[in-house]
UniProtKB/Swiss-Prot annotation:
GO terms for biological process: cell wall biogenesis; cell wall organization; response to water deprivation; xyloglucan metabolic process. Residues 1-30 form the signal peptide. Disulfide bonds join C232-C240, C277-C290. This is Probable xyloglucan endotransglucosylase/hydrolase protein 6. Catalyzes xyloglucan endohydrolysis (XEH) and/or endotransglycosylation (XET). Cleaves and religates xyloglucan polymers, an essential constituent of the primary cell wall, and thereby participates in cell wall construction of growing tissues. It catalyses: breaks a beta-(1->4) bond in the backbone of a xyloglucan and transfers the xyloglucanyl segment on to O-4 of the non-reducing terminal glucose residue of an acceptor, which can be a xyloglucan or an oligosaccharide of xyloglucan. Keywords: Apoplast, Cell wall, Cell wall biogenesis/degradation, Disulfide bond, Glycoprotein, Glycosidase, Hydrolase, Secreted, Signal, Transferase. The record marks D112 as: Important for catalytic activity. The gene is XTH6. Its EC number is 2.4.1.207. InterPro entries: Beta-glucanase/XTH, ConA-like_dom_sf, GH16, GH16_AS, XET_C, XTH. Residues 31-224 form the GH16 domain. Belongs to the glycosyl hydrolase 16 family. XTH group 1 subfamily.
């Protein structure tokens, strides 16, 4: 016979209250994020301008400084996304970044989108990189198949126990699988914050540093809106990272589905311009994750 809730079952009462509070806590972490509630200026607050009552922002880069913002909390697994409209026209030498970072110095975990500025008429490149336990050097570059300065596009990082996927709109441009069983580093234990920055990097960003920033075109602007964070906030429920009921840990998200796999192959065949796995000048022997 099923138990009926009543004060005569104190253990059940405690469990019900705990479960309710936990679900409320997780629900809050999954609501649409806003800049005012969920983010703060990381540097040069004067160059971060709020719009639409904090639902959208503008980052500014000029000769004096760039700027950046960070989430107020850190998360352990989940999905983060933003809609971004990049710098139009001549943006050579600039980098607009959207990334997650554990902020743990030499052992940091980090998942990077870096949008590399261009000379007018050239395609915009996006570089992704993955740091696990302090080790990076996993760069891949893709030329975007549209002009990302004309309108907002959604950029997403999915981070689960099984894999990390970078999406441009609904198109996966990179997948990094968890191969810890083969002694390949994978970020599993360090919570990460969500960050974005706009800065000058003309020593490497555009054509390896050949194209320098043209300050006569400054100030440069990047725009953000529709912030979305669905993850396990830290501090938070201790069971959250391993909870199989979190949707990003569900069976449907343990690998790319058939449609995503086709789109991923299309990107790699038609738009990938650099892959560290095939760069024999840097890695005469491919890194272990490239052979897994």
């Amino acid at each position: 016979m099923a138990k009926i809730y009543s004060p005569s079952f104190p253990g059940t009462l405690c469990l019900c209250i705990f479960t309710l509070l936990t679900l409320m806590f997780i629900r809050v972490s999954a609501r649409p994020a806003t800049f005012v509630e969920d983010f703060k200026a990381a540097w040069s607050e004067s160059h971060i301008r709020q719009m639409e009552d904090g639902k959208a922002i503008q980052l500014v880069l000029d000769q004096s400084t760039g700027c950046g913002f960070a989430s107020k909390r850190k998360y352990l697994f989940g999905r983060v996304s933003m809609k971004i409209k990049l710098i139009p026209g001549d943006s050579a030498g600039t980098v607009t970044a959207f990334y997650m970072n554990s902020d743990t110095a030499t052992v940091r975990d980090e998942l990077d989108f870096e949008f590399l500025g261009n000379r007018s008429g050239q395609p915009y490149s996006v570089q992704t990189n993955i740091f696990a336990h302090g080790k990076g050097d996993r760069e891949q570059r893709v030329n975007l198949w549209f002009d990302p300065s004309m309108d907002y596009h959604t950029y997403t990082i999915l981070w689960s126990h099984k894999h990390i996927v970078f999406y441009v709109d609904d198109v996966p441009i990179r997948e990094y699988k968890n191969n810890e069983a083969k002694n390949i580093a994978y970020p599993t234990s360090q919570p990460m914050g969500v960050y974005s920055t706009l800065w000058e990097a003309d020593d490497w960003a555009t054509r390896g540093g050949l194209e320098k920033i043209d300050w006569s075109k400054a100030p440069f602007y990047a725009y953000y809106k529709d912030f979305d964070i669905e993850g396990c906030p830290v501090p938070g429920p201790t069971f959250c990272p391993s909870n199989p009921h979190n949707w990003w840990e569900g069976y449907a998200y343990q690998s790319l589905n058939a449609v995503e796999a086709r789109r991923y192959r299309w990107v790699r065949v038609n738009h990938m311009v650099y892959d560290y796995c095939t760069d024999r000048s840097r890695f005469p022997v491919p890194p272990p994750e490239c052979r897994a």
